[in-house]
A protein has these predicted regions:
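Short catalytic/metal-binding and nucleic-acid-binding patches
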Residues: 1-134
């Protein structure tokens, strides 16, 4: 899943806000394999959780929560109002392990590709919890 900033770039403290929003419902509403918050966009490799009662969390609801919370906090810090994120987002169903590895590696190496760090593990806004969904 990818979503983009409406305009400009996120300051470092704003990227922490977004990453915290992503982490907040990990294991409760979705399982994150990898998340990266870039200056102007976010990539997530996640799987929605299905509860014991059969309730699953839709991608649109998951995204609404992440974007809504982070936008409110970013606007509060900027003393601004209005949209932080573009309305559009892009998602894709990962159909096999090869595609999973491709997406995971793309997310991991996005900061190095954009020359924000030398190695993926050096980028403060890359999160890979290292857990598998139950």
């Amino acid at each position: 899943m990818t979503f983009r900033l409406k305009a400009g770039q996120l300051a470092e403290n704003e990227r922490y806000i977004v990453l915290d929003a992503v982490k907040h419902f990990h294991r409760l509403k979705y399982w994150i394999t990898a998340a990266v918050v870039m200056p102007d966009h976010v990539h997530l490799l996640l799987q929605p959780v299905v509860t014991e009662s059969g309730v699953d969390f839709s991608l649109s609801k998951i995204l609404q929560g992440i974007k809504g919370f982070s936008a409110r906090e970013i606007n509060r810090g900027r003393k601004a109002k209005g949209h932080v994120w573009q309305d559009e987002s892009y998602d894709r169903i990962v159909r096999d392990y090869a595609e999973f590895l491709e997406k995971w590696n793309y997310i991991r190496h996005n900061p190095t590709k954009d020359e924000l760090c030398e190695a993926p593990e050096d980028y403060a806004f890359l999160w890979e919890p290292g857990e598998a969904p139950e």
